[in-house]
């Protein structure tokens, strides 16, 4: 039972950190390359 409580307290924190960092990354990409359908750093 203690393991379940530990999981339920850790999983939301990790999910919040992961989705927050992912959102920040997407925001920065859209700030550097606005309205880009094909990103310049993918085409070599």
UniProtKB/Swiss-Prot annotation:
Q: Name one GO cellular component term.
A: chloroplast thylakoid membrane
The record's subcellular locations are: Plastid, Chloroplast thylakoid membrane
Q: Does the keyword section mention Transferase?
A: no
The Gene Ontology biological process annotation of the record reads:
photosynthesis
Name the keywords, alphabetized.
Chloroplast, Membrane, Photosynthesis, Photosystem I, Plastid, Thylakoid, Transmembrane, Transmembrane helix
Q: Pfam family example for this protein?
A: PSI_PsaJ
TM annotation in the entry: 7-27
The UniProt entry lists membrane topology as:
Single-pass membrane protein
Coiled coil where?
Answer: none
What is the purpose of this protein? May help in the organization of the PsaE and PsaF subunits.
Instruction: List the HAMAP family hit by this protein, alphabetically.
Output: PSI_PsaJ
| Entry similarity comment | Belongs to the PsaJ family.
Q: What is this protein called?
A: Photosystem I reaction center subunit IX
* The organism of origin for this protein: Piper cenocladum (Ant piper)
Taxonomy of origin reads: Eukaryota, Viridiplantae, Streptophyta, Embryophyta, Tracheophyta
Q: Which gene encodes it?
A: psaJ
């Amino acid at each position: 039972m203690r393991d379940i409580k530990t999981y339920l307290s850790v999983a939301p924190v990790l999910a919040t950190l992961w989705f927050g960092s992912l959102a920040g990354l997407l925001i920065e990409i859209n700030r550097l390359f606005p309205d880009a359908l094909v990103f310049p750093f993918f085409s070599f």
